[in-house]
Amino acid sequence: MPRSLKKGPFVDKDLMKKVDAAIANNDRRVLKTWSRRSTILPEMVGLTFAVHNGKKFLPVFITENMVGHKLGEFSPTRTFYGHAGDKKTKAKK
């Protein structure tokens, strides 16, 4: 179920402080964050975040198409190595 409109989008307070400081200083450094649950706001467009995926920080450059989504959507947490194939069918081909 989506979040109520009267509540507004959720953004971690500490993350918003970092964003406001980066905008005020015209600083384009990568902002490191663990807050995957924060919603991307229009003020964040053009900034780069290093979003933690559980193991390392992945750089995410924010574009206009990402507004309204969560930061965690752009930092995958699982690695897919593919399904194990049948060795006999591979040898025949």
From Swiss-Prot:
Gene Ontology CC annotations of this record: cytoplasm; small ribosomal subunit
Origin superkingdom: Bacteria
Gene Ontology terms for molecular function: rRNA binding; structural constituent of ribosome
BP-aspect Gene Ontology terms: ribosomal small subunit assembly; translation
Residue ranges the record marks as coiled coil: none
InterPro entries tied to this protein: Ribosomal_uS19, Ribosomal_uS19_bac-type, Ribosomal_uS19_CS, Ribosomal_uS19_SF
Record PROSITE patterns: RIBOSOMAL_S19
Alphabetical list of SUPFAM superfamilies matching this protein: Ribosomal protein S19
Record's keyword terms, sorted: Ribonucleoprotein, Ribosomal protein, RNA-binding, rRNA-binding
Similarity comment text for this entry: Belongs to the universal ribosomal protein uS19 family.
PANTHER family in the cross-refs: RIBOSOMAL PROTEIN S19P FAMILY MEMBER, SMALL RIBOSOMAL SUBUNIT PROTEIN US19M
Functional note: Protein S19 forms a complex with S13 that binds strongly to the 16S ribosomal RNA.
HAMAP family from the UniProt entry: Ribosomal_uS19
Record's protein name: Small ribosomal subunit protein uS19
Lineage per the UniProt record: Bacteria, Pseudomonadati, Thermodesulfobacteriota, Desulfovibrionia, Desulfovibrionales
Gene that encodes the chain: rpsS
